[in-house]
Protein backbone atom coordinates (compact mmCIF):
# COMPACT_ATOMS: atom_id res chain seq x y z
CA UNK A 1 0.00 0.00 0.00
CA UNK A 2 1.38 3.38 -1.02
CA UNK A 3 1.67 6.05 1.65
CA UNK A 4 -0.65 9.05 1.13
CA UNK A 5 2.31 11.44 0.92
CA UNK A 6 4.05 9.22 -1.65
CA UNK A 7 0.83 9.00 -3.66
CA UNK A 8 0.37 12.79 -3.56
CA UNK A 9 3.97 13.22 -4.72
CA UNK A 10 3.53 11.06 -7.81
CA UNK A 11 0.05 12.38 -8.73
CA UNK A 12 0.26 16.11 -7.88
CA UNK A 13 3.66 17.33 -6.68
CA UNK A 14 5.96 15.88 -9.39
CA UNK A 15 3.82 17.20 -12.30
CA UNK A 16 3.60 20.63 -10.60
CA UNK A 17 7.39 20.74 -10.23
CA UNK A 18 7.84 19.71 -13.88
CA UNK A 19 5.67 22.61 -15.06
CA UNK A 20 7.24 25.14 -12.67
CA UNK A 21 10.89 24.35 -13.49
CA UNK A 22 10.30 23.31 -17.14
CA UNK A 23 11.72 19.79 -16.89
CA UNK A 24 11.44 17.47 -19.88
CA UNK A 25 10.15 14.54 -17.82
CA UNK A 26 8.74 13.79 -14.37
CA UNK A 27 11.88 11.75 -13.70
CA UNK A 28 13.82 15.03 -13.55
CA UNK A 29 11.59 16.38 -10.78
CA UNK A 30 13.40 16.43 -7.42
CA UNK A 31 12.26 13.88 -4.88
CA UNK A 32 13.06 13.04 -1.30
CA UNK A 33 15.81 10.45 -1.23
CA UNK A 34 16.21 9.75 2.49
CA UNK A 35 15.78 11.23 5.95
CA UNK A 36 18.57 10.92 8.49
CA UNK A 37 17.81 11.32 12.20
CA UNK A 38 20.85 12.00 14.35
CA UNK A 39 21.01 12.27 18.11
CA UNK A 40 24.33 13.31 19.61
CA UNK A 41 24.76 12.20 23.21
CA UNK A 42 27.85 14.03 24.45
CA UNK A 43 27.37 12.83 28.03
CA UNK A 44 27.58 9.20 26.92
CA UNK A 45 31.33 9.34 27.63
CA UNK A 46 30.61 9.50 31.37
CA UNK A 47 27.37 7.54 31.52
CA UNK A 48 26.75 4.72 29.02
CA UNK A 49 23.12 4.37 30.14
CA UNK A 50 22.29 7.72 28.52
CA UNK A 51 23.22 6.31 25.12
CA UNK A 52 20.91 3.33 25.62
CA UNK A 53 18.02 5.69 26.42
CA UNK A 54 18.78 7.74 23.29
CA UNK A 55 18.86 4.56 21.19
CA UNK A 56 15.50 3.44 22.62
CA UNK A 57 13.93 6.84 21.94
CA UNK A 58 15.25 6.95 18.36
CA UNK A 59 13.90 3.42 17.82
CA UNK A 60 10.45 4.55 18.99
CA UNK A 61 10.52 7.71 16.86
CA UNK A 62 11.79 6.11 13.65
CA UNK A 63 10.53 2.55 13.83
CA UNK A 64 13.95 1.04 13.14
CA UNK A 65 17.06 0.32 15.18
CA UNK A 66 19.66 3.12 15.12
CA UNK A 67 23.35 2.84 14.36
CA UNK A 68 25.59 3.88 17.24
CA UNK A 69 28.06 6.55 16.09
CA UNK A 70 31.58 6.58 17.46
CA UNK A 71 34.11 9.38 17.91
CA UNK A 72 36.43 9.76 14.90
CA UNK A 73 39.31 11.14 16.93
CA UNK A 74 40.30 11.82 20.51
CA UNK A 75 39.69 15.27 22.00
CA UNK A 76 41.24 15.73 25.42
CA UNK A 77 39.16 18.82 26.26
CA UNK A 78 35.97 16.76 25.98
CA UNK A 79 37.53 13.69 27.68
CA UNK A 80 36.89 11.82 24.46
CA UNK A 81 38.80 8.83 23.10
CA UNK A 82 38.72 7.65 19.51
CA UNK A 83 36.09 4.94 19.03
CA UNK A 84 33.96 5.92 22.04
CA UNK A 85 30.21 5.77 21.39
CA UNK A 86 28.87 9.36 21.32
CA UNK A 87 25.53 9.23 19.53
CA UNK A 88 23.04 7.36 17.39
CA UNK A 89 21.63 7.83 13.90
CA UNK A 90 18.94 6.31 11.71
CA UNK A 91 18.58 6.51 7.94
CA UNK A 92 14.99 6.22 6.73
CA UNK A 93 14.13 5.43 3.12
CA UNK A 94 11.03 4.35 1.22
CA UNK A 95 7.78 3.82 3.09
CA UNK A 96 9.19 4.46 6.57
CA UNK A 97 10.63 7.75 5.32
CA UNK A 98 7.25 8.92 3.99
CA UNK A 99 5.49 7.76 7.19
CA UNK A 100 7.98 9.69 9.32
CA UNK A 101 7.72 12.84 7.18
CA UNK A 102 3.92 12.70 7.29
CA UNK A 103 4.02 12.34 11.08
CA UNK A 104 6.62 15.12 11.43
CA UNK A 105 4.59 17.62 9.38
CA UNK A 106 1.09 16.84 10.66
CA UNK A 107 1.64 15.76 14.27
CA UNK A 108 5.06 16.59 15.70
CA UNK A 109 5.86 20.09 14.41
CA UNK A 110 2.48 21.54 15.48
CA UNK A 111 3.29 20.31 19.03
CA UNK A 112 6.39 22.54 19.25
CA UNK A 113 5.96 25.37 21.76
CA UNK A 114 5.60 28.86 20.18
CA UNK A 115 5.75 27.36 16.70
CA UNK A 116 5.70 29.89 13.86
CA UNK A 117 7.00 27.69 11.04
CA UNK A 118 10.46 26.35 10.24
CA UNK A 119 13.25 28.47 8.80
CA UNK A 120 13.56 28.41 5.01
CA UNK A 121 17.27 29.28 5.42
CA UNK A 122 18.42 25.84 6.61
CA UNK A 123 19.28 24.48 3.16
CA UNK A 124 22.89 23.48 2.51
CA UNK A 125 23.28 24.80 -1.05
CA UNK A 126 22.85 21.34 -2.56
CA UNK A 127 19.13 20.92 -2.00
CA UNK A 128 19.22 19.21 1.41
CA UNK A 129 17.33 20.53 4.42
CA UNK A 130 18.40 20.25 8.07
CA UNK A 131 16.01 20.77 10.93
CA UNK A 132 17.01 20.85 14.59
CA UNK A 133 14.43 19.55 17.06
CA UNK A 134 15.08 20.90 20.57
CA UNK A 135 13.15 18.24 22.46
CA UNK A 136 12.18 14.69 21.59
CA UNK A 137 8.86 15.12 23.44
CA UNK A 138 7.15 16.53 20.32
CA UNK A 139 6.95 13.01 18.89
CA UNK A 140 3.77 11.17 19.93
CA UNK A 141 5.64 7.87 20.57
CA UNK A 142 7.69 9.38 23.39
CA UNK A 143 5.97 9.03 26.77
CA UNK A 144 6.50 12.19 28.81
CA UNK A 145 6.64 10.29 32.13
CA UNK A 146 9.35 7.88 30.97
CA UNK A 147 11.73 10.63 29.79
CA UNK A 148 14.37 11.55 32.35
CA UNK A 149 16.29 13.97 30.15
CA UNK A 150 15.20 16.25 27.32
CA UNK A 151 17.31 15.59 24.24
CA UNK A 152 17.29 17.21 20.84
CA UNK A 153 17.90 15.61 17.49
CA UNK A 154 18.77 16.62 13.95
CA UNK A 155 16.49 15.74 11.05
CA UNK A 156 18.24 15.90 7.66
CA UNK A 157 16.02 15.62 4.59
CA UNK A 158 18.14 14.63 1.59
CA UNK A 159 16.59 15.41 -1.79
CA UNK A 160 17.68 14.89 -5.39
CA UNK A 161 17.20 18.63 -6.05
CA UNK A 162 20.18 20.47 -7.55
CA UNK A 163 19.40 23.85 -6.03
CA UNK A 164 17.93 25.11 -2.77
CA UNK A 165 15.12 26.79 -4.69
CA UNK A 166 13.97 23.45 -6.15
CA UNK A 167 14.23 21.75 -2.76
CA UNK A 168 12.27 24.56 -1.06
CA UNK A 169 9.51 24.22 -3.64
CA UNK A 170 9.45 20.41 -3.23
CA UNK A 171 9.23 20.58 0.57
CA UNK A 172 6.65 23.39 0.46
CA UNK A 173 4.48 21.25 -1.86
CA UNK A 174 4.91 18.27 0.46
CA UNK A 175 3.55 20.43 3.27
CA UNK A 176 6.53 21.55 5.35
CA UNK A 177 5.36 24.59 7.36
CA UNK A 178 7.99 27.17 6.36
CA UNK A 179 7.90 30.55 8.12
CA UNK A 180 6.92 33.38 5.81
Curated annotation (Swiss-Prot):
BP term (GO), one: translation
Gene3D superfamilies the record matches: 3.30.1440.10
The keyword Ribonucleoprotein is assigned to this record: yes
InterPro entries named in the record: Ribosomal_uL5, Ribosomal_uL5_bac-type, Ribosomal_uL5_C, Ribosomal_uL5_CS, Ribosomal_uL5_dom_sf, Ribosomal_uL5_N
PROSITE patterns xref list: RIBOSOMAL_L5
Keywords, in A-Z order: Ribonucleoprotein, Ribosomal protein, RNA-binding, rRNA-binding, tRNA-binding
One GO cellular component term: ribosome
GO molecular function: rRNA binding; structural constituent of ribosome; tRNA binding
Disulphide bridges, residue numbers: none
Role played: This is one of the proteins that bind and probably mediate the attachment of the 5S RNA into the large ribosomal subunit, where it forms part of the central protuberance. In the 70S ribosome it contacts protein S13 of the 30S subunit (bridge B1b), connecting the 2 subunits; this bridge is implicated in subunit movement. Contacts the P site tRNA; the 5S rRNA and some of its associated proteins might help stabilize positioning of ribosome-bound tRNAs.
NCBIfam families named among the record's database cross-references: PRK00010.1 (NF000585)
Assembly and interaction partners: Part of the 50S ribosomal subunit; part of the 5S rRNA/L5/L18/L25 subcomplex. Contacts the 5S rRNA and the P site tRNA. Forms a bridge to the 30S subunit in the 70S ribosome.
Name of the protein: Large ribosomal subunit protein uL5
Provenance organism: Lacticaseibacillus paracasei (strain ATCC 334 / BCRC 17002 / CCUG 31169 / CIP 107868 / KCTC 3260 / NRRL B-441)
